[in-house]
A protein has these predicted regions:
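Acetyl-CoA-dependent GNAT
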Residues: 1-46, 58-60, 64, 101, ...
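Conserved acetyl-CoA-binding loop of GNAT-fold acetyltransferases
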Residues: 89-98
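Conserved beta-strand-loop-alpha-helix junction that forms the acyl-donor binding cleft
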Residues: 75-85, 101-107
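Non-catalytic, surface-exposed connector residues within folded enzymatic/regulatory domains
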Residues: 33-36, 51-52, 106
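Terminal substrate-recognition subdomain of acyl/acetyltransferases
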Residues: 106-120
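Conserved GNAT acetyl-CoA-binding A-motif
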Residues: 65-76
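Conserved glycine-rich acetyl-CoA-binding loop
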Residues: 45-59, 68, 79-86, 90
């Protein structure tokens, strides 16, 4: 990804400790519908969850999409990751498509669609 100019990746740090990571920009695992912008990953270690960090990160991603003059973006989520699904719903995500039923449950994905005009 170093050569890709529309892909941002961040480490979330707490002093010298890594608390998580997130990335956004061009979709890293293929496109979805006609969306050009994607929250590719968002992960916070359990001690850093439920502290408002995810909401702040999401606001940064939404702002980055706005700065690109986009009115929407998407993210993929494993169907079986209920905490992540609840988070994306709280952030205003609407389920667009679900691709489940795979033998390997890690391949079961759903796609959330977001508007950049919504405030969180």
């Amino acid at each position: 990804r170093l050569e890709q100019t529309d892909y941002m990746a961040y480490l979330v740090m707490d002093g010298g400790q890594c608390a998580g990571y997130f990335s956004y920009g061009a979709a890293s695992h293929g496109g979805y519908k006609d969306f050009s912008f994607c929250l590719n990953s968002l992960y916070l270690l359990p001690p850093y969850q439920h502290m408002g960090l995810g909401r702040r990160i999401f606001a940064q991603v939404r702002q980055a999409a706005r700065e690109r003059k986009l009115d929407s973006f998407f993210c993929g989520c494993n169907v079986h990751n209920l905490p992540a699904r609840r988070f994306y719903e709280k952030m205003g995500g609407v389920v667009g498509e679900i691709d489940d039923g795979h033998e390997n449950l890690a391949e079961d994905q759903m796609y959330f669609e977001f508007c950049t005009g919504e405030q969180i």
